């Protein structure tokens, strides 16, 4: 087994179809309500089980490999420590998703690492156990482990499966890095959106409570969102910088992409209520 490479484990992006900030807890974390949906644009990871306990990461992005605090390595080590597995893994990351854009790429990479190595190491942890490990590494990781579109509450850890419409999306990645920590620490961030039941939230217009703040501070995000709103209902995902517009067909999304100004970068993706990772996990 140590010489075999298990290939093409997807780490899909997510969109926050809405994001409401309901308050700040005593520990500094924020209470929120959000709706996660996956899209079919993914990072790809390959794994090789090794007899030695080290975790080795390769990537086409040198900045990822140079980061000793990388979530992929932390996830592998956390699973190893939780299970006492004596071996290790060599991991290859093909980075396709924009970094720091609100698409959850780092969290998704970590979740795919936990799910894949749990199978390849035959450590037999349940999804609940994997999600518990993942939550210690990042609040978004459990939704990627569980692999279904979800309404999330709390700090994002309480998940309820939902089936929003699987639209086609045009995602624009502005040339801006938005610090999630800075957004949540900003005194101008709204923190008083009333908590509502899921049925009410699913039936009313969707919004992102972080959007106005980020748009006011990042002209690149404001420009991308203003352009996209000319073609479709559009919002920011997470704390940005990525924005997305929803279309009823791939043809419509591609037609808008063809008009994208030359100083913007974007891609078309399909909404998915079941993660590509779950499809890969269940493959023979």
Swiss-Prot record:
Keyword ATP-binding: yes
Pathway: Isoprenoid biosynthesis; isopentenyl diphosphate biosynthesis via DXP pathway; isopentenyl diphosphate from 1-deoxy-D-xylulose 5-phosphate: step 3/6
Family matches, as SUPFAM superfamilies: GHMP Kinase, C-terminal domain (SSF55060), Ribosomal protein S5 domain 2-like (SSF54211)
Gene Ontology BP terms: isopentenyl diphosphate biosynthetic process, methylerythritol 4-phosphate pathway; terpenoid biosynthetic process
Catalytic activity from the UniProt record: 4-CDP-2-C-methyl-D-erythritol + ATP = 4-CDP-2-C-methyl-D-erythritol 2-phosphate + ADP + H(+)
GO MF annotations, alphabetized: 4-(cytidine 5'-diphospho)-2-C-methyl-D-erythritol kinase activity; ATP binding
Protein keywords: ATP-binding, Isoprene biosynthesis, Kinase, Nucleotide-binding, Transferase
E.C. designation(s): 2.7.1.148
Residues that, per the record, bind ATP: 98-108
Active site: 14, 140
UniProt superkingdom: Bacteria
Biological role stated in the UniProt entry: Catalyzes the phosphorylation of the position 2 hydroxy group of 4-diphosphocytidyl-2C-methyl-D-erythritol.
Family from the record: Belongs to the GHMP kinase family. IspE subfamily.
PANTHER family: 4-DIPHOSPHOCYTIDYL-2-C-METHYL-D-ERYTHRITOL KINASE, CHLOROPLASTIC
Identification of the protein by name: 4-diphosphocytidyl-2-C-methyl-D-erythritol kinase
Organism: Shewanella sp. (strain MR-4)
């Amino acid at each position: 087994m140590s010489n075999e490479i298990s290939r093409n484990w997807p780490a899909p992006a997510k969109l926050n179809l809405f994001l409401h900030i309901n308050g700040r807890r005593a520990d500094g974390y924020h209470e929120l309500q959000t709706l996660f949906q996956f899209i079919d644009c993914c990072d790809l990871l390959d794994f090789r089980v090794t007899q030695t306990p080290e975790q080795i990461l390769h990537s086409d992005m040198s900045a990822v490999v140079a980061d000793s605090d990388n979530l992929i390595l932390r996830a592998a080590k956390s699973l190893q420590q939780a299970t006492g597995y004596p071996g290790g893994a060599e991991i290859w990351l093909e980075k396709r998703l924009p970094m720091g854009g609100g698409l959850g790429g780092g969290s998704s990479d970590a979740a795919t690492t936990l799910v894949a190595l749990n199978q390849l190491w035959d450590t037999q942890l349940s999804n609940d156990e994997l999600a518990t490990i993942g939550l210690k590494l990042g609040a978004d990781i459990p939704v990627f482990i569980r692999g279904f579109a979800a309404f999330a509450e709390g700090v994002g850890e309480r998940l309820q499966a939902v089936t929003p419409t699987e639209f086609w999306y045009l995602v624009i990645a502005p040339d801006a890095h938005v610090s999630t920590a800075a957004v949540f620490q900003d005194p101008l961030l709204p923190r008083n959106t009333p908590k509502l039941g899921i049925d009410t939230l699913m039936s009313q217009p969707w919004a992102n409570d972080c959007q106005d703040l980020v748009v006011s501070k990042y002209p690149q995000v404001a420009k991308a969102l203003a352009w996209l709103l000319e073609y479709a209902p559009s919002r920011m995902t997470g704390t940005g910088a990525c924005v997305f517009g929803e279309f009823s067909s791939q043809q419509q999304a591609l037609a808008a992409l063809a008009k994208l100004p030359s100083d913007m970068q974007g891609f078309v993706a399909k909404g998915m209520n079941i993660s590509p990772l779950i499809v890969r996990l269940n493959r023979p």
